[in-house]
């Protein structure tokens, strides 16, 4: 008969994962096998995605910022080989779209996919469906948003783009650092956006949080995701922790509490309890 992982061990595993530990370092820290760690991640991640899909509704946001962050699964696009797609697998670039409430810091929605018009449109339609009122929306200058935003919101949005102007980087900086930003342009697209609030600072900070707190997003390591399903599960878990379980330093409460979606700070055990499935310890 297989041994079931104790709740204490489950809490240790999930705590390590949301604090930026890789799967293998989590194995070393907790003594739980790699297979069991991944099964727990998969189960809890799906439960977190389902819970947030139901709970994050009718959000009374006023200002929303949207951005997308790059990562990859299996191999970078330039290194993908036919064997990566064996058994229905996926390899290559993966983008995560994020929409954050600039006031409460609640991540209203996220989507994992390609950086293209189709994914942008689907993502923004989901964002629009979770809001209870008209918002001011800011994105970067990517052209895909010019069609995706009106498709999702029509004219019922104050939409602006913050377009960054970049200079040339030196040869060494091109590989390890973004190009030097020389300035920005604020461009009104729909409605009457307030220029004081045309910003992507909060969502860009959230991108940093993702890179810091999910090891599979950290550049120049071998901790990248090997399976798309695990990548998606970790992103759902990360956002559950961010929205419901982690106190924001400035707000002094969680984003979900600030947004009126939760009455308390969730514990890791509560997050795990979203799924009641026992997970057998791998031999």
Where are these regions (language model features)?
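Residue-level recognition of single "structural anchor" positions
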Residues: 1-283
């Amino acid at each position: 008969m297989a041994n079931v992982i104790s709740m204490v061990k489950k809490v240790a595993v999930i705590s390590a994962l949301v604090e930026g530990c890789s799967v293998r370092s989590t194995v070393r820290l907790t003594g739980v096998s790699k297979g069991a760690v991944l099964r727990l991640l998969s189960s809890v991640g799906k439960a977190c995605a389902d819970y947030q899909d139901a709970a994050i509704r009718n959000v009374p946001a006023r200002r929303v910022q949207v951005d997308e962050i790059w990562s990859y699964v299996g191999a970078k696009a330039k290194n993908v080989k036919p064997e990566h797609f064996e058994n229905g697998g996926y390899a290559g670039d993966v983008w995560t779209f994020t929409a954050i409430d600039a006031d409460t810091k609640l991540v209203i929605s996220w989507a994992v996919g390609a950086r293209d018009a189709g994914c942008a449109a689907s993502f923004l339609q989901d964002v629009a469906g979770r809001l209870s009122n008209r918002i001011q929306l800011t994105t970067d200058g990517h052209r895909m948003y010019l069609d995706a935003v009106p498709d999702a919101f029509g004219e019922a949005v104050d939409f602006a783009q913050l377009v960054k102007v970049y200079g040339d980087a030196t040869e060494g900086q091109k590989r390890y650092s973004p190009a030097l930003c020389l300035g920005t342009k604020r461009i009104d697209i729909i409605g009457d956006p307030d220029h004081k609030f045309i910003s992507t600072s909060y969502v860009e900070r959230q991108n940093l949080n993702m890179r810091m707190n999910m090891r599979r997003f950290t550049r120049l390591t071998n901790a990248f995701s090997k399976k798309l399903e695990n990548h998606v599960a970790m992103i759902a878990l990360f956002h559950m922790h961010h929205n419901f379980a982690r106190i924001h330093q400035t707000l002094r409460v969680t984003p979900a509490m600030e947004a009126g979606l939760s009455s308390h700070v969730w514990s890791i055990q509560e997050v795990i309890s979203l799924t009641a499935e026992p997970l057998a310890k791998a031999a």
